[in-house]
């Protein structure tokens, strides 16, 4: 039986997985252990930990109600990380996938869980050297978390599109805006969670999967959105790690604003038909970004993802004003209206330099604010 630890509605937090690169050719390097040794010599109080391979490090914010306070915390965490990285002559970068690393070169970080994942999934574990942003939104009850997860599912293409930053993979332009999610698709428990409508039903599903020996904990579900009962949150897991912390925080502000809308509109109920077009819309966002198509399965209309995002921003304007997220949404709006995305920026950088090493150098400079 999973217990949902109720939390304050609309509180939020983010996790960011970061690339660790050398400063010679800007390939990934096994630097997480050394970074953590230096970082942990200071009494910082931040949540900084290793990830599945040694060329990754994860930072997680504390719980926030205001996106500006979240940005201040991430800025301080970035300063701490940069100081440690400089001592080791390492670089740190955002981006959903390193442009030219090869999965077979990666080494699993030595924890019991990561060893088990590696034994179970084989080479997929090393291919999981991709970098995402996870956004948590607090919910008062498990029932509300299940409802919110389903209501947000229709907007998953928005989060994919606005964070997309993985056009290159293993030295190749994939033609995708976000190639990262294709790595996650290979896991058997990826995609979307089943259409259960309350916490008791979700518990029954989890107990059944557990009794069949398929899962041992919620960590075994790699869904795009999932409840996080120990935190009392809904977790959005589709975002590539943006190139800057400012965009990461703006995305969290957008998630908070959408969630407030759904908390206020309790008469809106989850619709199972949302999932008829879920995989199609998700693919369109990964492949084409703002130019992708989005089909509404309820009324059968089709629009561009760009137009759907901008219409949603308009719908949320009053709520954003009330919540204090207008500035966050305006940052996203300006990028969209200008046709800007991190994926396009990375491609433009490659067109200018002709060197993926130089692309990583530039994206590292962006994240490290240099």
UniProtKB/Swiss-Prot annotation:
The keyword Nucleotide-binding applies. GO terms for molecular function: ATP binding; glutamate-cysteine ligase activity. GO terms for biological process: modified amino acid biosynthetic process. Keywords: ATP-binding, Ligase, Nucleotide-binding. Pfam families: GCS2 (PF04107). It is an enzyme of class 6 (ligase). Transmembrane segments: none annotated. Its EC number is 6.3.2.2. It catalyses: L-cysteine + L-glutamate + ATP = gamma-L-glutamyl-L-cysteine + ADP + phosphate + H(+). It comes from the Bacteria. ATP-dependent carboxylate-amine ligase which exhibits weak glutamate--cysteine ligase activity. Belongs to the glutamate--cysteine ligase type 2 family. YbdK subfamily. This is Putative glutamate--cysteine ligase 2. It comes from Janthinobacterium sp. (strain Marseille).
């Amino acid at each position: 039986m999973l217990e949902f630890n109720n939390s304050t509605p609309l509180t939020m937090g983010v996790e960011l997985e970061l690339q660790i690169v050398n400063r010679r050719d800007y390939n990934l390097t096994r630097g997480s252990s050394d970074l953590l040794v230096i970082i942990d010599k200071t009494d910082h109080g931040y949540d900084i930990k290793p990830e599945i391979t040694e060329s990754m490090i994860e930072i997680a914010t504390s719980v926030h109600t205001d996106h500006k306070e979240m940005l201040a915390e991430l800025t301080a965490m970035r300063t701490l990380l940069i100081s440690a990285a400089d001592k080791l002559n390492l670089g740190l970068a955002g981006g959903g996938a390193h442009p030219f690393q090869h999965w077979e070169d990666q080494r699993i970080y030595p924890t019991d869980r990561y060893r088990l994942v590696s034994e179970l999934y084989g080479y997929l574990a090393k291919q999981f050297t991709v970098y995402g942003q996870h956004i948590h939104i607090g919910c008062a009850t498990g029932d509300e978390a299940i409802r919110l997860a389903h209501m947000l599912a229709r907007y998953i293409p928005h989060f994919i599109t606005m964070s997309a930053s993985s056009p290159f993979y293993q030295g190749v332009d994939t033609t995708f805006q976000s190639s990262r999610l294709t790595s996650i698709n290979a896991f058997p428990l990826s995609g979307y969670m089943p259409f259960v409508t309350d916490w008791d039903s979700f518990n029954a599903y989890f107990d059944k999967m557990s009794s069949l020996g398929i899962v041992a904990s919620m960590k075994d579900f790699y869904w795009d959105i999932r409840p996080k009962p120990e935190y009392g949150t809904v977790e959005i897991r589709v975002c590539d790690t943006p190139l800057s912390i400012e965009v990461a925080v703006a995305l969290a502000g957008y998630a908070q604003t959408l969630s407030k809308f759904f908390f206020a509109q309790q008469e809106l109920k989850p619709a199972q038909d949302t999932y008829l077009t879920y995989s199609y819309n998700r693919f369109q966002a990964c492949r084409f970004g703002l130019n992708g198509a989005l089909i509404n399965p309820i009324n059968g209309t089709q629009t561009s993802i760009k137009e759907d995002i901008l219409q949603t921003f308009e719908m949320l304007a009053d709520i954003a004003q009330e919540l204090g997220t207008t500035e966050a949404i305006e940052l996203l709006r300006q990028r969209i209206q200008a046709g800007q995305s991190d994926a396009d920026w990375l491609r433009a950088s490659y067109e200018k330099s002709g060197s993926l090493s130089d692309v990583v150098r530039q994206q590292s400079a962006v994240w490290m604010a240099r």
